[in-house]
């Protein structure tokens, strides 16, 4: 099977106010003028950083995707304003790019989904726990990752710059256990 290279250019940070949150009304007002609401380009993957009661301040909380709606629309639906330290929430958005000038909508959406799942699998953000369990239990999904590489550029924050299914999935499938004296070959 052919390798699939997914390149992601990250931008941020953005605040909840940047995507239309109004603290006084406790509501979002999504308009075309907002950053991250351009219906031609504001699709891809996003990271949310903020406070977590166990892990502390300014940590990776969540990785999500926006492929059917813009980043601003998608993020406004997730309830980040209810985080007890919502004023310090930071959002980073990743847009896919590649060698091909044009890509089909289906392929774009597929690559967004693959990259999102691979990033969740490798980084295990606290608020993605149900997605992590679904991915690790589904051998078909894990097999799908084997030939994928994700390259992160620019403001990728605490994500690894490069991920590969070769490292995260294929290697573990070939793993035969920890070395011990029980399975040691005798010295000559």
What is each PLM-predicted segment?
Residues 1-61, 67-188:
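Boundary/linker segments flanking structured domains
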């Amino acid at each position: 099977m052919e390798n699939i290279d997914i390149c992601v250019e990250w931008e941020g940070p953005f605040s909840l106010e940047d995507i239309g949150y109004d603290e006084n009304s406790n509501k979002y007002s999504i308009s075309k003028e907002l950053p991250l609401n351009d219906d031609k380009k504001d699709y891809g993957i996003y990271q949310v950083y903020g406070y977590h009661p166990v892990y502390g301040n300014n940590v990776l909380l969540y990785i999500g995707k926006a492929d059917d709606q813009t980043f601003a629309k998608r993020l406004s639906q997730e309830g980040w304003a209810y985080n007890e330290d919502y004023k310090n929430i930071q959002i980073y958005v990743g847009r896919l790019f590649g060698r091909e000038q044009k890509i089909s909508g289906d392929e774009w959406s597929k690559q967004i989904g693959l990259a999102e799942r691979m990033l969740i699998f490798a980084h295990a953000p606290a608020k993605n726990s149900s997605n992590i369990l679904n991915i690790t239990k589904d051998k078909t999904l894990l097999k799908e990752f084997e030939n994928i590489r994700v390259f992160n550029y620019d403001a990728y924050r605490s994500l690894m710059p490069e991920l590969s299914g070769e490292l995260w999935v294929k290697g573990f499938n070939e793993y035969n256990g920890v070395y011990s004296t029980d399975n040691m070959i005798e010295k000559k």
